[in-house]
Amino acid sequence: MSKIQIQLSDGRNINIDLYEDVAPITVKNFKKLIKENFFDGLCFHRTIKDFMIQGGGFVADGRAIKEKGGADTIKGEFLSNGVKNDLHHGEGVISMARTNVKDSASSQFFICSADCAFLDGQYAAFGKTSDEESLAVVKSISKVPTHSFS
C-alpha cells in the first residue's frame, strides 16, 4: 500500500491509501501521473451530493473549465472486464472514471462520498481515504453545486 495526498487550493487535504494488490495497473498509472505533475491545478469538475466527486481531467480558470487531455488509457481492472477487484465502492473509495468503453480510463477519477455498491464490479476501485478528516473533505466537496457550460 502507498499513500498520496491531494492538496486543495483552500489548504485542505485528502489523504488516500492506494491498493496496488487490488488494481496494480491503475495504481501504477495514477502514480505516474502524479510524478509527472499531471493533476496540478486540476479541479473537481463533477460533484454530486451523497454520491461522489470527480476530477483528474479539467482545469478551471474561474470562468470556464477546459479539458486537459493527454493521458493514455489503461485496462479497466474490474470484474465485468474479467479482472478480480473486490474493493467495495463504499464511502471514501477512489475509482477510475471511464466512458462506456471498459478500457477507456486514463486520468479522471472519482471518490465516493456515500456507499455506491451499484458501482462494484463496473469500475476500477483502487484505494480509499486514509482518515475521517479526508472523508469529511470529500463529503463537503460533494455538496458544492457545479454548473453546465453547454
Label each region the model flagged.
Residues 1-150:
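Cyclophilin-like peptidyl-prolyl cis-trans isomerases
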